[in-house]
From Swiss-Prot:
InterPro entries: HD (IPR001356), Homeobox_CS (IPR017970), Homeodomain-like_sf (IPR009057), OAR_dom (IPR003654), Paired_Homeobox_TFs (IPR050649)
UniProt superkingdom: Eukaryota
Gene giving rise to this polypeptide: ALX4
Principal location class: nucleus
Upper lineage: Eukaryota, Metazoa, Chordata, Craniata, Vertebrata
One GO cellular component, as annotated: nucleus
Modified residues (Phosphoserine): 186
The protein's name in its UniProt record: Homeobox protein aristaless-like 4
Motif position, OAR: 377-390
Amino acid sequence: MNAETCVSYCESPAAAMDAYYSPVSQSREGSSPFRAYPGGDKFSTTFLSAAAKGQGFGDAKSRARYGAGQQDPAAPLESGAGARGSFSKFQPQPPAPQPQPPAPQPHLYLQRGACKTPPDGSLKLQEGGGGHNAALQVPCYAKESSLGEPELPPDSDTVGMDSSYLSVMEAGVKGPQDRASADLPSPMEKADSESNKGKKRRNRTTFTSYQLEELEKVFQKTHYPDVYAREQLAMRTDLTEARVQVWFQNRRAKWRKRERFGQMQQVRTHFSTAYELPLLTRAENYAQIQNPSWIGNNGAASPVPACVVPCDPVPACMSPHAHPPGSGASGVTDFLSVSGAGSHVGQTHMGSLFGAAGLSPGLNGYELNGEPDRKTSSIAALRMKAKEHSAAISWAT
C-alpha cells in the first residue's frame, strides 16, 4: 500500500459489510473492496462524521449523479430499516412523497343537465355550437333529490351506461308513480261506486189493504212466525219472504211501543183515581153541615164539615142521607159509626173534640138505619165515571 493512501476501517462491522457490498464502491475501475481516502483527510472532521454515519465520500459523489425525482438503484438492495442503506442507530426520516402533477384536462367536458327521462329511452349527446370545446349535454336517469341534484355516484360514467341499465333505471323511476296512480281511484271509478251505492238503496214498500189484512191475521195468532209460515204468507200476499219478515219486525216494535204507552196510562189512571177523583167528588157533591144541636155551653154555632176524618173506607161519607129534623146528630152518627161498636168509638172521638156533655144523649139514643144496597151502587157508579174520565184524558193526550 502507498504511504499517501491508507485503508480506513469503519468503527462498526455492519458499516464495513455495507461498504463491501455497496455497488457504488464496486463500480469504480480497479478499486479495492475497501474504501480509501487521502491521507490529509483521514483525521478531518468530514472523515470522522462520515465514518460515524457509516458512509464515505464516494457515496455522496456517486449519489449526486441521480436526480431529485429519480430513485437510487442501490436502495432496493439495502435494508428497509434505514432510508439510504444504513444500519446505524441514527436512522434519518424517510423522504416525503412528492405530489403527483394533475392530469391534463380534456377539451371536451361533460355537463349533466336536468334529470328528465327522454321519450325514446336512448342516450343522446347534444352537442352545442361551440366547436372543439363545446359542452356535451348528458341527461341523467336517476331520481332527483330535494335539492335538484340527481342522486348518482360521483365516479359513475354516464356516457358508458348501456341501454339495458338505462331501461332498468327508467322502470324503477316510473314504478312508484304507477303504483301510486293505481292506488288512487279514477273519477270514472268514483262515479261507478256512487252509482252502485245508489242502486243498493231500495224503495219503500207499500202494502195493499188485502196484504195488511192477511199480515194482521197472522200477527194476531203469533208475533213470531217461523220460516214456513212466512213463506206461506208471502205466497198468499204476493210478497217476498224478506219483506214479510221485515214487516213482522216493525209490527212487533210498534206493539211493544203501544204496550209501554198503555202501562204508563194505567199507572196514571190509578194515581188519578186514588188521589184526584175523590177530592173532586167531595167538592162537587157535598157541602158543609150546620146543625143547631151542636151548640155548646157558650151558645155559639160552630160549622162542622161533613168529613172530619179520612172518609175513603167509610161509605156513609160519600152518600148523604135525609134524616128527620128531630134527630139532630143523625148525620154525624151515620158518618162515625158503621157497626154497633162504631157508635161507641164515634162517641169517644167527638166527646174529646166538643165535650162529652152535649153529645152523649144524642149519640146514645140514636139507632142505625143504614141502606147498604144504595151505598154499593153509588160506589160502583163513581168508579165507572172515574174510568171513563181517565180513558177520555188518555185518548185526548
